[in-house]
């Protein structure tokens, strides 16, 4: 059972997924900080001091903090756009590498050339037999 677990846990896909999750979480924190600490204050300056996080309505001690919800949606949109751009650049780079691999078709070996000639001769013989 332990060996099966080791095979599963240390497969390339599982390790890649784990690394992706950790990097994604860190990336999410960076983008959230960018939105919270830089973009939102800049928007506040442009729009006349608007702070989304303080927007709320309520009755008595109860409050609905819809400003936090707006801020979270804004964070999500920025994170989604950032990840989209990252994936787009990554796909473009990997597709270039694949195109280079496809272009690098090795020249046929001497044996392959001889086999091609033999094939062509056999085709000629078969076509001449069909005519006769």
From Swiss-Prot:
Its main location: membrane. InterPro entries: Mechanosensitive_channel_CS, MS_channel, MSC/AndL, MscL_channel. It is found in: Cell membrane. It is a multi-pass membrane protein. GO terms for cellular component: membrane; plasma membrane. The keyword Phosphoprotein does not apply. It holds the Pfam family MscL. One of its GO terms (molecular function) is mechanosensitive monoatomic ion channel activity. The chain crosses the membrane at residues 14-34, 38-58, 67-87. Keywords: Cell membrane, Ion channel, Ion transport, Membrane, Transmembrane, Transmembrane helix, Transport. GO terms for biological process: monoatomic ion transport. Homopentamer. Belongs to the MscL family. Channel that opens in response to stretch forces in the membrane lipid bilayer. May participate in the regulation of osmotic pressure changes within the cell. This is Large-conductance mechanosensitive channel. It comes from Bacillus cereus (strain ATCC 14579 / DSM 31 / CCUG 7414 / JCM 2152 / NBRC 15305 / NCIMB 9373 / NCTC 2599 / NRRL B-3711). The gene is mscL.
